[in-house]
């Protein structure tokens, strides 16, 4: 039997730290794959092919972000019932979440595939890259069920306190993805569509193997026929938690698309600098996201176990780890931003290098605000208040839209650099009082 891990006993800091490490490695793996995938497409298929993939990225994030958010939400009741040692209800939640995933993923795949071309036309996709973007997007949308199940199974396993098993399946998916990228593009000559097929196929294989492993190795998840029956009440609970988390990702994506569009109007140098800086920033942001994901499981289990005071202990421990990491990252990016920028552009591109440095220096200065955002947002989600977490996403969207419409026309690229930090500040201004409200409420619930 594979080991699940209860996070309701023991010191919070080592528990969260050990749980975070595999999540961090997984997130770093995803960012590394993103870079390699772009390099393969760009170097072997050319600039237009790379632009075709880029033209689809924001829409893919919009749709897959919703799916991934729902999967994370579906794992929260599982974590809560696991923490409460109510294993029968936990298994029923797992069964219903799989049933919901089947219906939702097929509906999303069908609708988005039908309107794929219309979506690209609405985004004013240039004609010279339209065909490549269309096939890349179409294959990605057709593969939504594989992506949905892969992320749902990983979420369920993490809910049981096991963050290592999802990492190994992510590693398998990444290696297979890169190998298939090379095979489909270089050997079969399938072009941009081949890159999308490689991603969908590798996630499909990983999802199937993950399900087989989960059912064979986690005895606690083996269901009876009665436990596998669809339950409307449980389905409503899952949707109540999962859909707001999905919408949170999609809402955030809308604000990011607006900021990207405003930056596009500033010229090639700003676009290139923004692209390079975002890739670097996303890599260094991984620990914050990983800490947040760990807090979702930690808070969910302790909420289910009736130990809300441990949630505050977890927040303090996570904040301490976040500050230590930020101090390290601040030094690295303040003195090494240009070195990282040189991974993307030649040393002669002085304007791009300067703009990349500026973006990274401003972003890293506000990383503690981002770290607190991730910790509080995921903690609130973990105890089931996903609507509040979604509203923090709305706060981010509003901030980015305001920066895009009001600040960028007046201050140019400098305003773009402050777009994300402004969004983080807006979100924290909402999340801090929201967390205080939620924490006090669950303390009162325990007393009553």
What are these regions, as identified by a protein language model?
Residues 1-20, 78-143, 187-243, 299-366, ...:
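Short alpha-helical transmembrane segments in multi-pass integral membrane proteins
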Residues 14-75, 79, 243-263:
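Signature of the first transmembrane helix
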Residues 18-34, 139, 150, 173, ...:
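Transmembrane helical elements of multi-pass membrane transporters/channels
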Residues 28, 32-51, 120-127, 183-190, ...:
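Helix-terminus/linker motif at the lipid-water interface of multi-pass membrane proteins
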Residues 41-61, 127-132, 192-193, 234-241, ...:
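Interfacial/gating helices of multi-pass transporter permease domains
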Residues 50-110, 147-166, 273-337, 370-392:
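Small-residue-rich hydrophobic transmembrane alpha-helices
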Residues 62-65, 109, 177-181, 207-211, ...:
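Hydrophobic transmembrane alpha-helices of multi-pass small-molecule transporters
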Residues 71, 139-158, 166-174, 195-210, ...:
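Short runs within selected transmembrane alpha-helices of multi-pass transporters and secretion channels
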């Amino acid at each position: 039997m594979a080991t699940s891990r209860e996070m309701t006993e023991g010191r919070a800091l080592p528990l969260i730290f050990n749980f975070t490490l595999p999540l961090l490695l997984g997130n770093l793996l995803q960012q590394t794959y993103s870079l390699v995938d772009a390099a393969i497409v760009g170097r072997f298929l050319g600039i237009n092919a790379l632009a075709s993939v880029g033209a689809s990225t924001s829409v893919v994030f919009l749709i897959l972000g919703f799916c991934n958010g729902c999967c994370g939400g579906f794992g929260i009741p599982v974590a809560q019932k696991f923490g409460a040692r109510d294993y029968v209800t936990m298994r029923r939640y797992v069964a219903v979440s799989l049933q919901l995933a089947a219906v939702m993923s097929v509906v999303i795949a069908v609708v988005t595939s039908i309107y794929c071309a219309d979506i690209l036309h609405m985004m004013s996709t240039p004609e010279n890259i339209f065909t490549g973007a269309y096939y890349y997007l179409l294959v990605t949308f057709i593969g939504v069920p594989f992506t949905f199940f892969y992320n749902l199974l990983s979420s369920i396993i993490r809910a049981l306190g096991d963050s290592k098993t999802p990492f190994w399946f992510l590693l398998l998916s990444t290696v297979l993805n890169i190998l298939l990228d090379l095979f489909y593009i270089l050997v079969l000559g399938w072009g941009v569509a081949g890159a999308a097929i490689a991603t969908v196929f590798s996630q499909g294989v990983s999802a199937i193997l993950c399900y087989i492993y989960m059912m064979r190795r986690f005895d606690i998840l083996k269901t009876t026929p009665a436990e596998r029956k669809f339950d409307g009440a449980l389905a409503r609970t899952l949707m109540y938690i999962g859909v707001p988390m999905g919408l949170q990702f999609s809402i955030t994506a809308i604000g990011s698309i607006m900021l990207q569009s405003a930056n596009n109007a500033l010229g090639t140098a700003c676009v290139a600098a923004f692209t390079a800086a975002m890739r670097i920033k996303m890599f260094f942001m991984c620990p914050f996201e990983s800490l947040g994901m760990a807090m979702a499981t930690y808070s969910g289990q302790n909420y289910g176990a009736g130990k809300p005071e441990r949630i505050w202990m977890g927040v303090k421990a996570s904040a301490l780890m976040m500050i230590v990491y930020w101090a390290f990252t601040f030094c690295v990016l303040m003195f090494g931003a240009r070195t990282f920028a040189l991974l993307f552009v030649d040393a002669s591109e002085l304007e791009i290098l300067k703009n990349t440095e500026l973006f990274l220096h401003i972003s890293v200065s506000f990383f503690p605000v981002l770290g607190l955002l991730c910790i509080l947002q995921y903690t609130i989600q973990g105890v089931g208040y996903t609507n509040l977490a979604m509203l923090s996403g709305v706060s981010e969207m509003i901030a980015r839209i305001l920066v895009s419409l009001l600040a960028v026309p007046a201050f140019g690229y400098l305003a773009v650099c402050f777009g994300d930090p402004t969004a983080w500040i807006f979100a924290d201004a909402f999340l801090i009082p929201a967390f205080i409200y939620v924490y006090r409420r669950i303390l009162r619930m325990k007393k009553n």
